[in-house]
């Protein structure tokens, strides 16, 4: 049974869904995330396996001394990392292609050409043209300049802009280009010729913008955008209120597809000085008592607020597996379980999805705050020691406090309580998601939403009145 509050929240959520699912942009976003999912699953599995099993500082690599009995372990890890670069680190460009492609269908444009021009524009904007156009420069720029799932907003923005620019240029070109009198006269060649002008304009503008971005010294358009919203160094004080606020800002950026200032893979970078002093005192005294900095970003956020990645994603994955009544949700949850245990949350971001999903935005923002509060209280009152020793970036988040305090059981218990607190935050929202799904099945939602819930979208995408080629793909 659902409580009155859950029914009220479900009604509000369904109202929001009713509004946004009529928007072409939202339809294209959902289709884009669905099409990205297989690549994200493969890339995340490769990352999780390579970095936890075949890399020198990996969790399983260190525990089972894999390098001693498998000399080729690091070579295997490098190959798997390279394969993951082709999938995960190219998500921005794939997102630009797919988003532009689906938008083009909705606008009755040539979806294949529009998708390709958007992807090329995204690649051009990520390359530093002033550094010299070489194979090495282009390759490193595309794989290392924030092209992953966590910056998918950049790809969507480029895809949207490229589509609208193509649409406008195509309208201008239609005033002087000869259009076929009948649809039978339209061929691949004529459609390609009509696309020369809009494609040229979009790519030329992308090159010009890339040159301007290169002058700023930033790593592509994604780097410039992240730099423009970055917090100043002085903002990272170690008061618990500041930690909470920066965590909230970080996760707000995450749900719209941008990297925030915090990451489980950047431990000790925000508070490296404080962590170093804590470690020095602990090594000198042989005790974790009377440390100079008990509350820092590392001892609170990394340890208690980022289990499974930002947003306490591990708690969401476990809650989905246990409580969701939607088969697709549970399947994605099982796929996401191992990578999330190793702190890779890309599958959850794209598959549930968390990105741009009204139902999961609120708990994604609240769960880390609640979990950090649970961890901060015993830490503040001296009931548990702070984490001092280096831990595995790819280890299960709920073991970080235990390992980082050299096996303190009170720290482990606090981690478990923090995890359960995050889990409880997600539970009512999963129940609301179940209720919305049940109403979809019983036909209480409009037909358009029922079709959208299937994530196929074929019926939602209007067909061309007289297509020259009777296929959904154009090239």
Write out the residue ranges for each language-model feature.
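Membrane-embedded translocation segments of transport machinery
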Residues: 207-226, 231-322
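Signature of multi-pass transmembrane helix bundles
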Residues: 1-41, 46, 52-55, 71-72, ...
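A cytosolic-side transmembrane-helix exit/cap motif
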Residues: 133-140, 240, 283-286, 352-356, ...
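Hydrophobic alpha-helical bundle architecture
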Residues: 103-107, 297-304, 316-387, 402-415
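Hydrophobic, membrane-inserted alpha-helices
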Residues: 94-99, 246-250, 313-317, 342-350
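Interfacial loop/helix-cap signal at membrane boundaries in integral membrane proteins
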Residues: 58-82, 86-98, 140, 240, ...
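Short, amphipathic, aromatic/basic-enriched membrane-interface segments that mark the entry/exit
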Residues: 11, 15, 81-86, 330-337, ...
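Juxtamembrane non-transmembrane "cap" segments at the membrane-aqueous interface
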Residues: 58-63, 270-282, 372-396
